[in-house]
């Protein structure tokens, strides 16, 4: 039941996110292609680090202020991955992370103002905020996740790989999923309160008061000491996602060294000092290891990206033509049935054209990109898919008309892809 609830809530979060910012997310994966030359692939770090080295995932919860300085003692003994909202706090304490990580397309620029950030190894989802990459100009950019067929093929052609890393909707969860993918057998969490510890929401935030508003409903959960603590519904979903990750990976030791915040089942509670003393013993030149991974698209990278953008543009232009043709045949079929023109041969040919179109669209390398950019059209179609008519002819008419509407929605929506491609070409 716990697993089912996690899947359901994760799906709800993904769906709501796509409806709100799906187009923005999809277009970011195009804009960010200009950062591919000389980047690294996160997949190249899989099973790369020594087995005794733990990963420390640093989030921005209020308890981070308790132990952030201790991260200096873990330098060279653990891989420190700092989530974007914790970067300024961590680096203000003189801690140089091994990696920072960012995911969200709309992450605010104020999270990336730390001095020296450009020198830190910068983990980015393919759909990360383009404005952040433009502002920070990371010297060591590492793309770690994509669901884009184009990106995956490009990394494969370059002798590496790149797939989707996702665990439930927060940057810290992505960082944990990445640590699992990289093969770490011990994951230490700090700043992962997921609750209003000490009447605060974030490590660098102000105290909450009666006028504080939240972007989701609130509820109470047990903290690590057994007391009730206030949290938010989305935080509660993240708590369950962490529990689910730990439950599904019994061979990995999940340590909650937050020293406060919500209780997370299937994790071990200890202080960060205890975790460092017990599990961060051997010293390695971590920076040298990270730097040793080769850069990708270092030779003629800009030209390669331009070629890929041109291919994508041609594919989208063909899609627009074919989607409009699909809408026309759907309208034709609906018209025939509405006027009682039951020509089975003509309808059979129309259905075959629709089948071929749907299969071609599903096989497009850009399919997932298109679904994001046209998420509203897809959502509108899916919300009516089960509103069936009792009469079979009326039901067929409904399906044809809804399909035509979807095809037109896709054809109209992908015009933004072409605009973004053209803008990206200018900026290379």
Describe the function of each predicted region.
Residues 86-87, 94-104, 179-205:
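Glycine-rich phosphate/pyrophosphate-binding loops
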Residues 101-107, 114-119, 204-220, 274-283:
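Acidic, Ser/Thr-rich peripheral helices and adjacent loops at domain boundaries
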Residues 248-428:
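Long, compositionally biased charged/polar accessory segments in the mid-to-C-terminal portions
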């Amino acid at each position: 039941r716990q697993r089912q609830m996690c899947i359901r809530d994760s799906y709800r979060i993904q769906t709501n996110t796509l409806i709100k910012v799906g187009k923005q997310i999809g277009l970011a994966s195009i804009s960010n292609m200009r950062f591919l030359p000389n980047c690294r692939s996160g997949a190249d770090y899989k099973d790369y680090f020594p087995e005794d080295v733990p990963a420390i995932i640093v989030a921005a919860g209020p308890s981070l202020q308790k132990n952030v300085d201790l991260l200096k003692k873990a330098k060279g003994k653990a891989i420190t991955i700092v989530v974007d909202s914790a970067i300024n706090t961590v680096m203000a304490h003189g801690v140089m992370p091994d990696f920072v990580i960012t995911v969200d397309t709309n992450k605010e620029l104020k999270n990336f103002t730390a001095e020296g950030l450009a020198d830190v190894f910068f983990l980015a989802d393919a759909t990360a905020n383009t404005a952040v990459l433009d502002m920070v100009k990371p010297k060591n950019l590492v793309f770690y996740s994509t669901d884009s067929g184009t990106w995956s093929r490009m990394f494969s052609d370059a002798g590496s790989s790149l797939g989707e890393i996702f665990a439930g909707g927060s940057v810290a969860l992505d960082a944990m999923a990445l640590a699992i993918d990289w093969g770490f057998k011990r994951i230490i969490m700090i700043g992962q309160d997921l609750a209003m510890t000490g009447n605060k929401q974030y490590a660098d935030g102000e105290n909450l008061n009666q006028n504080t508003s939240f972007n989701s409903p609130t509820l109470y959960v047990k903290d690590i000491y057994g007391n009730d603590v206030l949290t938010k519904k989305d935080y509660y979903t993240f708590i369950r996602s962490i529990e689910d990750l730990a439950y599904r990976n019994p061979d990995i030791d999940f340590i909650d060294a937050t020293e406060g915040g919500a209780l997370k089942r299937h994790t071990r509670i200890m202080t960060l000092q205890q975790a460092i003393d017990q599990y961060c013993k051997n010293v390695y030149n971590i920076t040298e290891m990270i730097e040793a991974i080769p850069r990708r698209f270092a030779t003629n990278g800009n030209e390669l990206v331009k070629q890929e953008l041109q291919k994508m543009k041609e594919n989208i232009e063909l899609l627009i033509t074919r989607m409009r043709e699909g809408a026309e045949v759907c309208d034709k079929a609906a018209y025939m049935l509405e006027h009682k023109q039951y020509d089975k041969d003509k309808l059979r040919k129309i259905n075959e054209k629709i089948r071929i179109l749907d299969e071609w669209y599903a096989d497009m390398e850009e399919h997932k990109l298109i679904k994001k950019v046209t998420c509203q059209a897809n959502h509108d179609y899916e919300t009516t898919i089960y509103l069936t008519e009792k009469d079979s002819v009326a039901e067929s008419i409904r399906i044809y008309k809804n399909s035509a509407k979807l095809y037109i929605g896709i054809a109209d929506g992908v015009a933004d892809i072409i605009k973004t491609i053209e803008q990206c070409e200018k900026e290379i």
